[in-house]
């Protein structure tokens, strides 16, 4: 009972408005594009301490419209999309059994650093399965995060094996748990957001490459901007309700823009010539594999949809290509140029642009 009370309190806890966040445009753009198209593959946010990483991630989750689920379902199953529902609900749908529906806020799940594999994936009661022949599954954090956002702070300190599991589930949209020959599978489609401080160590390149985007954020140096950030935070801490009310109009406008972009996304086209140039940039940067090409195409379409366009242009690509490729470049200790600057330089050369 006490746990239930605690959860209810957390649900009504005021969240700093996304539209009130000053600066950090790169991080905000990466999060919005992943929300518009979760197939981009999540975002890794690396930056200094105290730069608003956690605040921004919680704010984007709070901004999103409510989702329709099967009532009291442990996996946030979609009531009609079979790719987003559990086997039990799929069976009920196929047999014409009436399914009760409900609306909830987009799930925002925090993965603690000390989490075990069982806590993340869920557990099967082997004893009950063997003695009674009943599959009893205790869902983990991946089930809770289905159709939502899974946030891992200090992901660079997380066990590599767990990072692998998260990335596999995020890419496939499913979580499979196998114990002693017994297998349980459930939908686990979520936006994976990792954050960390580069001073505390980097992720292995093989794992970093699996993140769709990589945003780098730095402490704001402009004194006027710093004052504005401090004022915004102070106003929110003193009177959260008033701060949220002041931002309500901008929040509603952005929420609608994201919802419209999600609907428009499937109709967006990108010319063959532009696709060739994207691959040319990846080739000249010596990017391993094809993930860079695929993610850049998806991100450019999501950006075009966000702006209400029907087709992708070179300006759209310029806004997303650094986010999609900077973490895929091979590390050269003798290279003085920042990886982001290198991507921009090659992009301008391939697209015959001096500056965007």
From Swiss-Prot:
Known pathway: Porphyrin-containing compound metabolism; chlorophyll biosynthesis
Swiss-Prot/TrEMBL catalytic activity: protoporphyrin IX + Mg(2+) + ATP + H2O = Mg-protoporphyrin IX + ADP + phosphate + 3 H(+)
GO annotations of cellular component type: chloroplast
CDD domains in the cross-refs: AAA (cd00009)
Single annotated GO MF: magnesium chelatase activity
Cysteine disulfide links: none
Keyword ATP-binding belongs to the record: yes
Pfam families in the record: AAA_lid_2, Mg_chelatase
Biological processes per GO annotation: chlorophyll biosynthetic process; photosynthesis
Protein localization: Plastid, Chloroplast
InterPro entries, A to Z: AAA+_ATPase, CHLI-like, ChlI/MoxR_AAA_lid, Mg_chelatase_ATPase-isu, Mg_chelatse_chII-like_cat_dom, P-loop_NTPase
Keywords from the UniProt entry: ATP-binding, Chlorophyll biosynthesis, Chloroplast, Ligase, Nucleotide-binding, Photosynthesis, Plastid
Family: Belongs to the Mg-chelatase subunits D/I family.
Function of the molecule: Involved in chlorophyll biosynthesis; introduces a magnesium ion into protoporphyrin IX to yield Mg-protoporphyrin IX.
Descriptive protein name: Magnesium-chelatase subunit ChlI
Species the sequence originates in: Porphyra purpurea (Red seaweed)
Classification of source organism: Eukaryota, Rhodophyta, Bangiophyceae, Bangiales, Bangiaceae
Gene from which this protein is expressed: chlI
